[in-house]
Amino acid sequence: MKKYTWRTHKIVKETEDTVTIYFDAIAQKMTYLPGQYLNIRLNINGELLIRSYSLSSIPSDSYPAITVKRVEGGKMSSYIVDHAANIETWDITGPFGNFILDQKIADQQQVVLLAGGSGISPLFSMLKSIGSTKHTPLLIYSSKSPEETIFWNLLTSLEAERTLDICYSFTAPEFVSTKMNHIPGRFSLLVLRSVIKRLVAAINDTHYYICGPVALMDLYRDALIGLKIPEENIHMEYFNATSADLANFETDGNTNEVIVTHYEDSYVDDEIQTYECTSLIEVKPRQPLLEAMKTHGINVASSCNNGTCGTCWAVKTTGTIHMPRHDALPPQDIAAGIVLLCQSYPLTGDVCVTLQ
């Protein structure tokens, strides 16, 4: 997993609580796909935080960009929105994620993007990458009001150019509109199904990409399932993934011992010395390796704890584990033995992992 140090190119204020950061990455270019995300690491008031943010730019853009919306109680999102202009350099790893646009499908069929709030970021990247096609993409977007809609001006321009169809749901109580595709209030299953049947020509052949708050995403999915849309045509990315279901794998109920190779820093004569350490730790049944390592005092970088950010990766050299979620890992990483510690449950007593 590649690491980058990028500088701030410019900051654009999208709404009162949302900014887009454009990075100067000319010296350290990244290869990514529309829909993928980055991990950002910041030291905020002495606390090291790592968070994941989707790229809202496309690979052909001169400057890669992320769009950050303030989240209630979110330390990093609030800090970025308030202080982005004062951040000169950014520690970045990535790209991550398998929530990507299938360009062949976009060239041949209509694509429907279903967004809520800051979930527009990866979908906006997909939208910009579609380009000219005989099938006009459709965006279904739930927001509070036009003033609080991220990318409002850009989306309005695309709609005026007839390169994009949009149906909004505006949830602010004071919102009133006579436009057919500006719906006051929250989407309902009935309204969503009506919108899709009205605006999508071949609903069963169309592919649907969904991103936003969990409850809204589930509503979108339920509406599509109710229209008999094939499961393989529904693509989703949860910003806050739910905990892995531990009922789907069996264990013998025994505590397993795991060998962990890791690295520790120590000061010697005012200089940092790094030492390779090997620890034998006990892992309880249905206990993730990440939790067990922290219990045994092993320093492990982590963030999401649900397999979506990729921060807590390690290399498994022997043994068998159960890894229910691995959204952050491409197939080639899994084949190479890379695991996510927050999602790694040892099934045998010969598991060995190495922290990088």
Predicted features, each with a name:
Residues 1, 7, 226, 231, ...:
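Iron-sulfur (Fe-S) cluster-binding modules
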Residues 2-89, 93, 109, 143-145, ...:
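Ferredoxin-reductase
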Residues 59-63, 104-107, 346-356:
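Ligand-binding loop in jelly-roll beta-barrel domains
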Residues 79-262, 267:
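FNR/FR-type flavoprotein reductase catalytic core
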Residues 235-295, 311-316, 344-356:
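Redox cofactor-anchoring modules in respiratory/redox and cofactor-processing assemblies
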Residues 68, 114-115, 143, 211-212, ...:
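Small/polar loops that bind or transfer phosphate-bearing groups
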Residues 131-138, 319-328:
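Phosphate-handling active-site elements
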Residues 122, 294, 298-322, 333-348:
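Local cysteine-cluster metal-coordination motifs and their immediate loop/turn environment
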